[in-house]
């Protein structure tokens, strides 16, 4: 049966992979989305609701959902969990005061049944800001070492400078191709 599905997928093309970009407000989610889509920084405003764009990366098509991260919007994230292949969780590495809140939101999200099979890429963003948490500090602060039975990787990034996004997307694309 799997061979037949692979044959038809080859004939008609693979489906778009669904990726959610999540994280607290101000973490850089929208900047990352448009950096991936158009290759440059665009002026953004706080996302009230969501942005959804198609992103092509190394011959793969992704439907990328950037969900607002404000306190009032986070409870609605779960409305978008169905059929999610991967999560890009963005952390503002320069916002030491809210890393605990980010940890709580991540832990709550990862308990959802609909996300059990989703690959997780954590982006320790804003690495270009002096005094920010290092990649290792973000990893520990989020409690990622305690996660079991989940495909996960953390990357240090600067969305505004475009640094670290290619390694993250390479890893994500590779993981998603292996899951197909």
From Swiss-Prot:
PROSITE patterns: ARF. Expressed in neuronal cells. Expression in hypodermal tissues is absent. This is ADP-ribosylation factor-like protein 1. Disruption phenotype: RNAi-mediated knockdown results in male tail tip defects. Belongs to the small GTPase superfamily. Arf family. InterPro entries: P-loop_NTPase, Small_GTP-bd, Small_GTPase_ARF, Small_GTPase_ARF/SAR. Pfam families: Arf. Coiled coil: none annotated. One of its GO terms (biological process) is intracellular protein transport. PANTHER family: ADP RIBOSYLATION FACTOR-RELATED (PTHR11711). A lipid is attached at residue 2 (N-myristoyl glycine). The keyword Nucleotidyltransferase does not apply. It is found in: Golgi apparatus; Cytoplasm; Cytoplasmic granule. GO terms for cellular component: cytoplasm; Golgi apparatus. Keywords: Cytoplasm, ER-Golgi transport, Golgi apparatus, GTP-binding, Lipoprotein, Myristate, Nucleotide-binding, Protein transport, Transport. One of its GO terms (molecular function) is GTPase activity. SMART domains: ARF, RAB, SAR. GTP-binding protein that may be involved in protein trafficking; may modulate vesicle budding and uncoating within the Golgi apparatus. Plays a role in male tail tip morphogenesis. Its main location: Golgi. It comes from Caenorhabditis elegans. GTP binds at residues 23-30, 66-70, 125-128.
